[in-house]
Amino acid sequence: MRVVGTFASMAVLALAACSGKPADDAIVAVAQSSEPATVASYPDSSQPPAAEPAPPVAAEEVEAPSGNHVALKYLIGDIDPAKDPMFAKIPEKYLGGSRVWGHKDAVDAFVRMAEDAASNGYVLKAVSAFRSFSDQKEIWENKWNGKTAVGGKKLNVSTPDPKARALKILEFSSMPATSRHHWGTDFDINNLNNSYFNTRDGKRIYDWLTSHAPQYGFCQVYSAKGADGRPTGYEEEKWHWSYMPVASWYLKQYPIDVGYERIAGFDGATSAKDIDVIKNYVQ
């Protein structure tokens, strides 16, 4: 496997992934720039868009890690991004939440995309990015134990059956050790509700992302069920965009290195195997 650091290759990979086609096993595209990212001023989003941006320029080729192997700690979020050179901070200008870290190549691509969107009157902000195992455990257990209501209900009261309770949470939240957010490749953009993307402003953003995000390597991985032959997994998330040049690489490695013995250490973990969460929610 070789790594190709061109945005043209990224676009091919992302478009293939977004259309449901498997990526070329022989190529993993990883965009990485040695230059610091620059940020631009956001115009008023009510202004009419200017001409569409030109396709991004090519980036330099980068070396793949030894053996092209993704270490287990990256797959399950067992890292501190502030101490890991694989991660970078999202510039404050492009943040809409408190989760500031992402895989450095994904951050670079997101900044490029946000800059080009801004120049055309579209404001993109990451409201969530990397989450550690501990972060995801807190989200999951708050829902599992009724601290955070799900659909207006405390699931520890309304849904005592462990498998049924896990399935309800899995509509929109991942089990710890199974979230794509562990990889730092996935960004929640602008809002965490599908209803927002049906508003005038939200639809405008979503339409731009649908048309242009693949140019930068991003794909909406949780599209509407049934629309693209996706019978299982999470419900549609119009806000969730994945940087496929790196994420597809991690996804290929995940079922090789992560077994159900690794999906443990949180309330409700015993349901993971019964649900076959790796097959139905990760792959």
Regions found by a protein language model. Name each.
Residues M1-I27:
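Sec-dependent N-terminal signal peptides
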Residues C18-Q283:
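Extracytoplasmic cell-surface/polysaccharide-interacting catalytic and binding patches
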